[in-house]
Swiss-Prot record:
Organism, as annotated: Halobacterium salinarum (strain ATCC 700922 / JCM 11081 / NRC-1) (Halobacterium halobium)
Stored SMART domains: TOPRIM
Top-rank taxon: Archaea
Compositionally skewed regions (Pro residues) per UniProt: 286-296
The protein's name: DNA primase DnaG
Annotated cofactor note: Binds two Mg(2+) per subunit.
Binding site for Mg(2+) 2: 215, 217
Family: Belongs to the archaeal DnaG primase family.
InterPro entries listed in its UniProt record: DnaG_primase (IPR050219), Primase_DnaG_arc (IPR020607), TOPRIM_DnaG/twinkle (IPR034154), TOPRIM_dom (IPR006171)
CDD domains reported in the protein's UniProt record: TOPRIM_primases (cd01029)
PANTHER family (alphabetical): DNA PRIMASE
Pfam family, one: Toprim_4
Length: 406
């Protein structure tokens, strides 16, 4: 009966005297008989399996007996409540005066539902071999495996598949760094595998536009110093202080490469950090030196400073690109990152080390170019004209060369 019961009636009783369990059961049968009619007679309900056995627990102390009654019911709510109220009509148990009061009527199904929920929580926390994987996680895992499979070597050193064909190269410390950059779509990275720079990579840095992307620690400083001596660096990007390139998120990688500095202006991170270290062995930092006045730039940097102070305007870029069948990738300051044939602009945007802020192209802006630009985070696309777009992302602004030149 307990397996099919819908409700459990719980009642408490107090008896002015010492009674046994059988006295309580007999009182429940005898004093409710005929009270509710034949349809709710306890013996008949038990015979038809609509009511379970009457379970009684009883204790005696100080000349009084007290305990509780539990009855399982598969009747409906109204009939169960009526039967429970009938139990309170019991006034005597055995030869003694008694008081019976229904404490509660428990919905067994609700209790089972609570058990199911609690068990489901437990299983969710402990029974699965792996955490829940959503669709984005699955796609990222597949992309990562494909990109890791794409890892090649350059003269025996780990490299992305585009190192030979690209006109720019990103030099990193180890294989794990190459894998991380591949995962984020950067396919022209090559690893030096230590602080001793291989001759092949030193030569590569002289042949291509070279960016060193190094860890934010003393090891990165050592590699940077040696690259500056045996190779030819154009730019330097660093992981945040104390962090490794292989552990960086996509956002941090993009930010570091976008904010790369000219190699001539790059300062070692460890040196910068140690400037505030104590000079006497104490824990108190040494005073920060006053910055040198910048009223007298060195003669060697005059040309660079002038160029940096006055980059071409967007209109000038648009006029320069018009009728040339070329494309320019520009950063936030409208400085040129790269110039490629217009036919290669989609691949150039997709594979750019540093995500361009603006792309100016002497060609029609197609849906494919717009999709790739929006995916990479390009803010503005400027072209000779535009296709009819099926969808146009709000984050990427589309204009024509004529608009930009005015």
């Amino acid at each position: 009966m307990e397996d099919t019961a819908k409700y459990l009636i719980h009642a408490d009783f107090v008896v002015d005297g010492v009674v046994e369990r059988s006295d309580v059961v007999g009182a429940a049968f005898g004093q409710t008989e005929g009270l509710l009619g034949d349809d709710l007679a306890i013996p008949d309900l038990q015979d038809s399996a609509k009511l379970g056995r009457i379970d009684v627990s009883v204790d005696s102390e100080g000349g009084q007996s007290f305990g509780d009654i539990t009855i399982a019911s598969s009747l409906d709510r109204v009939e169960t409540a009526t039967l429970a109220a009938a139990l309170e009509a019991v006034e005597r148990i055995g030869p003694c005066r008694a008081d019976v009061e229904v404490d509660r009527i428990e919905d067994v199904r609700a209790a089972k539902r609570r058990e199911v929920v609690d068990r489901a929580k437990e299983l969710l926390a402990t029974a699965f071999d792996e955490g829940a994987i959503n669709a984005d996680d699955i796609l990222d895992e597949v992309r990562e495996s494909v990109r890791v499979d794409d890892i090649t070597d350059y003269d025996g050193y780990p490299a992305g598949p585009n190192v030979d064909s690209s006109d720019a190269v990103v030099i990193v410390e180890g294989r794990a760094d190459v894998v991380t950059l591949l995962k984020y779509g950067i396919k022209n990275a090559v690893a030096v595998e230590g602080t001793n720079i291989p001759d092949a990579i030193a030569a590569l840095s002289r042949e291509k536009t070279a960016t060193a992307f190094l860890d934010g620690d003393r090891g990165g400083d050592m590699i940077l110093r040696e690259l500056g001596q045996v190779g030819s660096l154009d730019f330097v990007a660093r992981a945040p202080m104390g962090e490794c390139v292989e552990d960086l998120s996509r956002r941090t990688v993009d930010s570091a490469l976008r904010n790369k500095t000219p190699a001539s202006a790059a300062a070692p991170i460890a040196t910068t950090q140690s400037e505030t270290a104590a000079t006497d062995g104490s824990a108190t930092p040494a005073p920060t030196p006053e910055p040198a006045p910048d009223t007298a730039p060195s003669p060697d940097s005059d040309g660079d400073d002038t160029e940096a102070a006055a980059p071409p305007t967007l209109a000038e870029h648009a006029r320069a690109v018009a009728d040339t069948e070329t494309a320019r990738l520009l950063d936030d300051a409208l400085a040129r990152i790269r110039e490629v044939p217009a036919a290669e602009v989609v691949d150039a945007v997709a594979d750019a080390d540093s995500v361009p802020a603006v792309v100016v192209v002497d060609a029609t802006i197609t849906q494919r170019l717009l999709d790739v630009a929006a995916q990479r985070g390009v803010a503005s696309l400027i072209g000779a004209d535009t296709d009819e777009f099926v969808k146009q992302p709000l984050a990427t602004r589309v204009r024509t060369l004529d608009d930009a030149r005015t």
